[in-house]
Design a protein with these regions (language model features):
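Beta-propeller domains with acidic blade repeats across secreted/periplasmic ectodomains
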Residues: 1-262
Length: 262
């Protein structure tokens, strides 16, 4: 659950095994179908054979949880979401590890969860390739892993590029990825940088401390020991607060948002 940029809405993310909560409205056109040009090859181990579109989803609701609106769909199993300085929403989506080596394997990836977006998860071999006109590609592919927490670098006492980054945690490979965004059209592309790494380092979630600007992250799970770590900057670069917003592409993002509101 993530508080929206205006402080008035709660954004809720759920994986492909979680049913939609019967939202009263939808920003996503409800045109999803399970028709396939070629017969689907279901998962050989039986995973999610009976789970149909729209897969994982993002909804937003009021603080009381009374009115729900569907924002974005087609995810595999996104654990965490966060907003950047432009008020744009990003998630770290899971892969289906049993698909590894198949033509339809989709690695863990960072998705720009635009209003009305469809990211193409379908069970078995039915997943949409990123070049399909009715789906959206990732901002950046990460690779095999187990996504957990996602946070914004806003408020961190770090150099400016790290304040503007999105941080994505991978439990399996013990990495906290700094996702450095670059505007592209009305969206973004990105490069990843391993900000923190260790083996083992089963990272679960993180937060930027609102007072001291350090990053705190937790590790543990599945029988491993739990710890809490703190990351602080020590160096000569300025840590003066930056907005994290991008001037490049601002006009196009404004147009896209106006279209999303139609």
């Amino acid at each position: 659950v993530e508080l929206g940029p205006n402080g008035k809405k709660l954004y809720v993310v759920a994986g492909n095994m979680t049913q939609l909560p019967s939202p009263e409205s939808s920003l996503v056109p409800k045109v999803w179908q399970e028709d396939q040009l070629l017969p689907r090859m279901p998962d050989a181990r039986g995973h999610a054979r009976s789970v149909m579109a729209p897969g994982g989803w993002v909804c937003r609701t009021d603080p009381e949880g009374k009115a729900w609106e569907l924002v974005s769909t087609g995810f595999r199993n996104t654990y965490g979401i966060a907003f950047n300085g432009d008020g744009e929403l990003f998630g770290y989506d899971s892969d289906m590890e049993w698909d590894a080596g198949s033509p339809w394997y989709r690695p863990t990836r960072i998705c720009h969860a635009v209003n009305g977006g469809e990211f193409g998860w379908r069970n078995g071999s039915g997943k949409f390739p990123p070049y399909y006109a009715d789906t959206l590609p990732a901002v950046v592919d990460i690779g095999p892993g187990s996504p957990t927490g996602v946070i914004s670098g806003s408020g961190a006492k770090f150099p400016s590029k790290y304040q503007s980054a999105i941080y994505a945690l991978d439990w399996t490979y013990g990495s906290i990825w700094a996702i450095h965004l670059k505007p592209e059209g009305s969206s973004y592309n990105a490069v990843r940088e391993e900000f923190v790494g260790g083996k083992p380092l089963p990272v679960t979630d993180a937060i930027i401390h609102p007072k001291n600007g350090s990053m705190y992250f937790a590790v543990g799970g599945r029988g491993s020991k739990s710890f809490l770590y703190k990351v602080s900057y020590s160096g000569n670069e300025s840590t003066k607060a930056v907005s994290g917003s991008f001037a490049d592409g601002k006009g196009l993002r404004t147009i896209r948002r106006s279209m999303e509101d139609l």
